[in-house]
Structure formats: structure tokens, C-alpha cells
């Protein structure tokens, strides 16, 4: 997937919506997440145990990997220092100042959403990329160096695989653009993993996880979970 053009990438990601609908029906779950390490495979993970009405679900277990462990995980990590976040921001931006367009199109129901506040510049942040319609910033609780969150400037449902095709395609296009920024940066990432999950904040968002060369150790394995516990891998 890392070698796909923007149009090809959007087309492939868009096709997962149809499969996700089939998975939902077959497994009788209200939500399905997407995980890909940007190789040849895209995983669609049914979120067993999640209720139909959105409620936040957070995994209390924290983790951090200095090198790629052989899998992706959406778990949070311990709070990173500002020095680490500043360096990661500089690496991704290649030392150039990142524009800060604070335009946000939240409605009255979502104006106090965490992401709305970040987009408007009301909270400390480490923005690494933006366009007229989307913003990408480092998460201070990343489980790997340079972990990035991408959000639209307007509120969209956090169940990304159920978004209308137009909104979904625009988001996928922004993901591709942000991935190119990360891969071409000084971060040293060979490719960038992608996760659609949406159970921490009720605002559509993509998690972009830089995948750098491993250190040759045997890849770790994540345990099988029968119900969703706040993270996917």
C-alpha cells in the first residue's frame, strides 16, 4: 500500500467500507475497526462488546516501543516529554514551521470536543501537517515515536467505516497526504501504519503510526481478546 498513488490509496481504503458492512452483519457488532501496517494486508476487526450508542472505551494498559515490535497497537503510551514531542514535530516538518490555521467547523453540540479545541489552538499541541479540511498532530501519549492523529476540521462521526463515501474519501485522501509528509520526513519511517477505531473521542480520526526498521529481534505477538477492551492491534 505504501507505493500506491493517492487515487489508488483512496480507492482501496474506500472498498473496505463494503467489506466492513458484511463483517458487521455477520458478527452482529455495531462497529468495525481498520488496521493496516501498509503492506499488502488490511485487517477489519469487529469490536465485540461495544454498544450501539457511542461511549468512550479506554484501554488502561500503556505501552511504548522504541522500535517496531512486529505489529501495530492503538494503545496509548506514557506521557511523552515536551522535548521528545518537539523533536518529533521538527523531524516530521523537516525543521520548517508548520502553519497553524485555527479554522474549525464544530457545531454547538461538538464545540467542546477535545479535537475541536485542538484545531482552534486552545490546547497545547504539536501540529505536523494541515490542509483546508484536515489537521494532523502528534499525540502526547503515543506508544511509538511520531505517532500522529489526523482529524477533519468539521465534526464527523467517529465510526469512520460508516461515513458517507464523500466524507470517507476526503478523509482517506488527507491520510495519504499526511503519510507522504511522514515518510519523506527526517523521522526515518519506511512506511506508516493506519488505524481507524474511534472509541476514545467521538470525532472521526485516523491514527498514523510510523514504522521504522526493527532491531532484528523476534516480533512480539499480541494476545487474542474475545471482547474489545479499548484498543486494537
What residue ranges belong to the model's regions?
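HIT superfamily nucleotide-processing domains
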Residues: 1-233
Amino acid at each position: 500500500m505504501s507505493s500506491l498513488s493517492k487515487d489508488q490509496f483512496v480507492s482501496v481504503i474506500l472498498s473496505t467500507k463494503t467489506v466492513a458492512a458484511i463483517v458487521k452483519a455477520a458478527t452482529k457488532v455495531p462497529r468495525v475497526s481498520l488496521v493496516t501496517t501498509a503492506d499488502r494486508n488490511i485487517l477489519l476487526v469487529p469490536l465485540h462488546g461495544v454498544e450501539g450508542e457511542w461511549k468512550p472505551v479506554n484501554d488502561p494498559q500503556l505501552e511504548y516501543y522504541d522500535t517496531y515490535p512486529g505489529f501495530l497497537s492503538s494503545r496509548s503510551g506514557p506521557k511523552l516529554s515536551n522535548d521528545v514531542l518537539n523533536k518529533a514535530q521538527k523531524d516530521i516538518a523537516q525543521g520548517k514551521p508548520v502553519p497553524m490555521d485555527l479554522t474549525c467547523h464544530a457545531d454547538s453540540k461538538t464545540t467542546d470536543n477535545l479535537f475541536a479545541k485542538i484545531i482552534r489552538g486552545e490546547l497545547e499541541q504539536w501540529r505536523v501537517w494541515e490542509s483546508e479540511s484536515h489537521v494532523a498532530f502528534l499525540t502526547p501519549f503515543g506508544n511509538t515515536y511520531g505517532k500522529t492523529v489526523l482529524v477533519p476540521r468539521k465534526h464527523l462521526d467517529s465510526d469512520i467505516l460508516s461515513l458517507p463515501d464523500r466524507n470517507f474519501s476526503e478523509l482517506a485522501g488527507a491520510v495519504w497526504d499526511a503519510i507522504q509528509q511522514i515518510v519523506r520526513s527526517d523521522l526515518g519511517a519506511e512506511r506508516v501504519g493506519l488505524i481507524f477505531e474511534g472509541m476514545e473521542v467521538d470525532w472521526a480520526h485516523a491514527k498514523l503510526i510510523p514504522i521504522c526498521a526493527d532491531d532484528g529481534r523476534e516480533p512480539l505477538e499480541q494476545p487474542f481478546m474475545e471482547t474489545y477492551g479499548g484498543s486494537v492491534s
